[in-house]
Amino acid sequence: MSLELLSQLETKIQTALETIELLKLELDEEKEKAANLAEQNHQLKQELSSWNDKITGLVGLLSNQVD
């Protein structure tokens, strides 16, 4: 191989490595976002469950008052 071809190959490899590193960073960011969203989803589900329990209790109280 000529030096020019080796130089071109080296440049392409370096570009590929840089692209891989950037993609790894993006993947890590997306994983962190996903984890945060999963935690937020869990908290919202707990809040919804709590509100459902409160509403069920209030409906029960209203039912008792009507009877």
Swiss-Prot record:
Keywords: Cell cycle, Cell division, Coiled coil, Cytoplasm, Septation. It is found in: Cytoplasm. The keyword Cell cycle applies. It holds the Pfam family ZapB. It comes from the Bacteria. InterPro entries: Cell_div_ZapB. Its main location: cytoplasm. Belongs to the ZapB family. Homodimer. The ends of the coiled-coil dimer bind to each other, forming polymers. Interacts with FtsZ. Non-essential, abundant cell division factor that is required for proper Z-ring formation. It is recruited early to the divisome by direct interaction with FtsZ, stimulating Z-ring assembly and thereby promoting cell division earlier in the cell cycle. Its recruitment to the Z-ring requires functional FtsA or ZipA. This is Cell division protein ZapB. It comes from Shewanella amazonensis (strain ATCC BAA-1098 / SB2B). The lineage of its organism: Bacteria, Pseudomonadati, Pseudomonadota, Gammaproteobacteria, Alteromonadales.
